Amino acid sequence: MAASAARGAAALRRSINQPVAFVRRIPWTAASSQLKEHFAQFGHVRRCILPFDKETGFHRGLGWVQFSSEGGLRNALQQENHIIDGVKVQVHTRRPKLPQTSDDEKKDF
């Protein structure tokens, strides 16, 4: 299962221009299928990623939801309250990663 989650996370990183929501405070009782089911009401969900902690075996309480269209992401962001397993989760747009700068570029002297 960990290998498939790693492949899914890598696929999300490669899909920079895809509409992806970052979800925080996901209850440990929730599964990726529940996440997908909840967000499907806003638009077609391509995939959900819940990274797991190797030591505890539980997911980390955060995840990503990739929508098929920008409209699905927009609809999800417009909803004020997202309740999963009785817990209000936080939904944000995924911020693109900034290019890493080397130590030489950081020095300005």
Curated annotation (Swiss-Prot):
UniProt keyword terms in alphabetical order: Mitochondrion, Nucleus, Phosphoprotein, Repressor, RNA-binding, Transcription, Transcription regulation, Transit peptide
Modification type Phosphothreonine: residues: 101
Major subcellular site: mitochondrion
Domain named RRM: residues: 19-103
SMART domains: RRM (SM00360)
GO cellular component: mitochondrion; nucleus
Record PTM Phosphoserine, positions in chain: 15, 102
InterPro entries according to UniProt: Nucleotide-bd_a/b_plait_sf (IPR012677), RBD_domain_sf (IPR035979), RRM_dom (IPR000504), SLIRP/GR-RBP-like (IPR052462), SLIRP_RRM (IPR034152)
Compartments (UniProt record): Mitochondrion; Nucleus
Alphabetized Pfam families for the sequence: RRM_1
Origin superkingdom: Eukaryota
Signal peptide: none
UniProt GO MF annotations: RNA binding
Purpose of the protein: RNA-binding protein that acts as a nuclear receptor corepressor. Probably acts by binding the SRA RNA, and repressing the SRA-mediated nuclear receptor coactivation. Binds the STR7 loop of SRA RNA. Also able to repress glucocorticoid (GR), androgen (AR), thyroid (TR) and VDR-mediated transactivation.
Protein name: SRA stem-loop-interacting RNA-binding protein, mitochondrial
Species this protein is from: Pongo abelii (Sumatran orangutan)
Gene of this entry: SLIRP
